[in-house]
Amino acid sequence: MRKALMVLSVAGLAGVAFADGGDYGLLIQDGKVVTGVGDHDEQVIENIGERVFAADMSLVGPNWFADEPGIFIEAGSMPDNSGIGFVIESPVMRWDGTGDVDFSSMSSAPITLEFGPNSVSSSMFAGDVAGFDINYDADNPSGFDEHWDVLLDSSAGTGIYLMQLRFTVGGFEDSESTWTVFNAGLSEDIHDAAIDYVETVIVPAPGALLAMGGALVLGARRRR
């Protein structure tokens, strides 16, 4: 059951398309959080090791909005009352959808993740931003299926936005970095091209994106 208190209640939001057809699926392997593709309908996690996810955003009021991907954990697969958390690892990057895929530009606005009273926004500078925890009830026969609200100020403009984060569970090693490719108002062909780029270029060499983000931040500081 979703416990998230939806900030926005809008009928007919655009459907969400996933590169991998599901939520962030979390499990524990050898003492470490591992990601895969969560299917809450079938109550399974597939494609273990998947680290690239995707969603479409809808323009709702002053924000681009999504409530996907959610987080899915199989019933009884983690200690009861574990805190399921996350860390946003870098500023959100943006590609305007023209020319070759290029995530060298930082978004002019942060992405904010909200779940009930909890809220955290990505940084405009290099470095980690600690998120919040959501309680895991191991006794829920339907498993853990929670969805936060993803908000991006519409002033950032249409584009493809790339969010990098890792997941945390108390008592276990954090997950590897994951990347979520959000489509704000562009075609699915452009979205697919961005997803392919992240899967083939950024995931094998994540340090390249971190270096780009760091260079942008340093440049912004020098210009002040």
Question: Which functions belong to the PLM regions below?
Answer:
Residues M1-A4, A220-R224:
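Positively charged n-region of N-terminal signal peptides that target proteins for export
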Residues S9, V198-I202, V217:
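Generic secondary-structure transition motif, activating predominantly at the C-termini of alpha-helices
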Residues G15-A19:
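Sec/Tat signal peptide C-region and signal peptidase I cleavage site
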Residues D20-I202:
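Mature extracellular "passenger" or substrate-interacting domains of secreted, surface-exposed proteins
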Residues P204-R221:
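A short, hydrophobic C-terminal helix/tail in secreted or cell-surface proteins
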